[in-house]
């Protein structure tokens, strides 16, 4: 995979729930949108699953995921779960001419952004995770990140030691 979502960006969410997609992420979205030929690009925002953030996939990556779901036997609990949380609870999103999206109501609900917070102004954190990116409410992201690091690694440990289990 040549193109990847990397980095962490804090972006303002305005009173109309508009938020700018970080420019480096826009390039990856464009590269992963087979119909993109300039102008507006699209991606898929998934708000299903038991988590406090939404995940966003390029159109090409979502097509790969859908193929994997289709390969599961119909009617099985695993397939139904994935269909519901990855397909039903997902939205196609299109960037406007300024590289923004309107965070949909279901996405705002998942992030815990209230109407009052929108009026007063809030921030979202965009976190690149290789083949997808996550959108978090900024303060939730900071708290989760701190808690996760505390559990996974003792202070001063080499983070690459986590790769040793993969055999690479």
UniProtKB/Swiss-Prot annotation:
Keywords: Cytoplasm, DNA-binding, Repeat, Transcription, Transcription regulation. InterPro entries: MraZ, MraZ_C, MraZ_dom, MraZ_N, MraZ_sf, SpoVT-AbrB_dom, SpoVT-AbrB_sf. It is found in: Cytoplasm, Nucleoid. Residues 8-51, 90-140 form the SpoVT-AbrB domain. GO terms for molecular function: DNA-binding transcription factor activity; transcription cis-regulatory region binding. It holds the Pfam family MraZ. GO terms for biological process: negative regulation of DNA-templated transcription initiation. One of its GO terms (cellular component) is cytoplasm. NCBIfam families: PRK00326.2-2. Belongs to the MraZ family. PANTHER family: TRANSCRIPTIONAL REGULATOR MRAZ. Forms oligomers. This is Transcriptional regulator MraZ.
